[in-house]
Curated annotation (Swiss-Prot):
Keywords: Golgi apparatus, Hydrolase, Membrane, Signal-anchor, Transmembrane, Transmembrane helix. Residues 30-452 are lumenal. Residues 64-74 have a biased composition (Pro residues). PANTHER family: ENDO-ALPHA-1,2-MANNOSIDASE, GLYCOPROTEIN ENDO-ALPHA-1,2-MANNOSIDASE-LIKE PROTEIN. It comes from Mus musculus (Mouse). One of its GO terms (cellular component) is Golgi membrane. This is Glycoprotein endo-alpha-1,2-mannosidase-like protein. The keyword Nucleotidyltransferase does not apply. It comes from the Eukaryota. It is found in: Golgi apparatus membrane. Residues 40-90 are annotated as: Disordered.
Length: 452
């Protein structure tokens, strides 16, 4: 009898032990507190990979309160947006928005088209202090494996003159809902220190953009001897040569007049007094109320430039730089004050947003200005900050400035014997195009509310 009771107790103990073990096992399957029960979207994914030893990103200043971000996409499978799977004709069903501008560079060349690489083999720029410069590598990059970029383009080190490249770029711009391509421009026969003249490529860019319902504005770069007189000649040349093209961008101002819009890079290199000769009503060679009038947007770098831009007769200002905190103009926390100044003085404020910044492939000493992409989070923070100030136009730095790592163009993972390139993993190469479209649609909806 005692033996039977002992067996029953042992059996009961084993049953209880089994039940307790099962319950504990089930508890281990529960998601830990603070983690999402579902798979992460782009905002929750792990940080992007970067080569060992790459500097940790500097923490950007907190962005101001912003409108709530648009709802994330579902995880439902969808067809690839790549050109190989898409219809070869322009995707006319996708809308683009003329209030969304992207800075575009046509300075790239390859042996297949130009006989040699252009810009992909960019020099490593020495620091202005010889003592600092001595600590960093010098020389020129050696494509195709070694590019003057921290990312590797999906198209490889391409030529901007390749018609297939132009079509693919317009496809990507359209996927991103970008309605205006802002073309980096030098006068005929001129180029930057690492490039070759590209004005003869403008007709092909205009023609291709027109097929995709994209418009083209001009980003006038600094060149030797640039002043108010030469810019007058530049404006006349651009309007006379390209102004009648269907893809030439014109902005409708508050008076209902459609005028060409020009971005003037490094405008602060010319004095406000000289600009006033060109941009004010009574200037000695004023273009106001002439066939060459336009909307002229100056670059804002330092806080004092706001008053210089106003005195010079410009119509507005943009910030260009994608490194939050790099300058007064590029710091998100200053945009509200800048917008208030512009509103008070009847100027347009065009904030520039970027997906990140890293130019150490060409300026190896400049790692303190690196801004990590954080899988799109940095980009979305900038877009939030821009929408908070209710701008008329948002500009994107950039579509394809690969040297400074600000591109939203598709990039792919790449490892060579001497280089480990950054990439967009764990996301697809189209991540920044998709984020741009999502925020563009949100921007347009917000604008409709602002105008009510």
């Amino acid at each position: 009898m005692a033996r039977r009771r002992r067996r029953a107790c042992i059996a009961l103990f084993l049953v209880l032990l089994f039940a307790f073990g099962t319950l504990m096992g089930l508890r281990t399957l529960k998601a830990p507190d603070g983690l999402p029960a579902l798979g992460p979207g782009p905002e929750l994914a792990p940080f992007e990979r970067r080569p060992e030893g790459n500097p940790a990103p500097a923490r950007a200043p907190a962005a101001p309160a912003a409108p709530p971000p648009p709802p994330p996409r579902t995880a439902a499978p969808r067809a690839s947006l790549g050109p190989a799977e898409a219809d070869p004709a322009p995707r006319q069903s996708l809308r683009v928005y003329s209030d969304l501008h992207a800075f575009y560079y046509s300075w790239y060349g390859s042996p297949r088209r130009e006989g040699h690489y252009i810009h992909w083999d960019h020099v490593m720029v020495p620091h202005w202090d010889p003592k600092i410069s001595a600590s960093y590598p010098r020389g020129r990059h050696s494509p195709p494996d070694d590019l003057g970029s921290s990312f590797y383009p999906e198209l490889g080190p391409y030529s901007s003159r390749d018609p297939d490249v132009l079509r693919e770029h317009m496809t990507q711009l359209k996927e991103a809902a970008i309605g205006v391509l802002v073309l980096s421009w030098y006068p005929p026969g001129m180029a930057d220190d690492n490039g070759e003249p590209t004005d003869d490529l403008v007709p092909a860019i205009l023609d291709t953009a027109h097929q995709y319902n994209i418009q083209v504005a001009f980003h006038i770069q600094p060149y030797k001897g640039r002043d108010d007189i030469t810019v007058h000649d530049n404006i006349k040349y651009i309007i006379d040569t390209y102004g009648s093209h269907g893809a030439f961008y014109r902005y409708k101002n508050s008076m209902g007049k459609s005028l060409p819009l020009f971005y003037i890079y490094d405008s602060y290199l010319t004095s406000p007094e000289a600009w006033a000769h060109l941009l004010t009503q009574n200037g000695p060679h004023s273009i106001r109320n002439t066939p060459y009038d336009g909307v002229f947007i100056a670059l804002l770098v330092e806080e004092s430039h706001t008053h210089d831009i106003l005195a010079a007769g410009f119509d507005g200002m943009y910030t260009y730089f994608a490194s939050n905190g790099f300058s007064f103009g590029s710091s998100h926390q200053n945009w509200k004050a800048v917008k208030n100044f512009c509103d008070t003085n009847n100027l347009m404020f065009i904030p520039s947003v970027g997906p990140g910044y890293i130019d150490t492939s060409i300026r190896p000493w400049n790692n303190h200005n690196t801004r990590n992409r954080v899988n799109g989070k940095y980009y979305e923070t900038a877009l939030q900050a821009a929408l908070t100030v209710r701008p008329e136009i948002v500009s994107i730095t950039s579509f394809n400035e690969w040297h400074e790592g600000t591109q939203i163009e598709k990039a792919v993972p790449k490892t060579t014997p001497t280089r480990l390139y950054l990439d967009y993993l764990p996301h697809q190469s189209s991540l920044y195009l998709e984020l741009t479209r999502r925020w563009a649609e949100h921007f347009i909806k917000e604008k409709e509310q602002w105008l009510m």
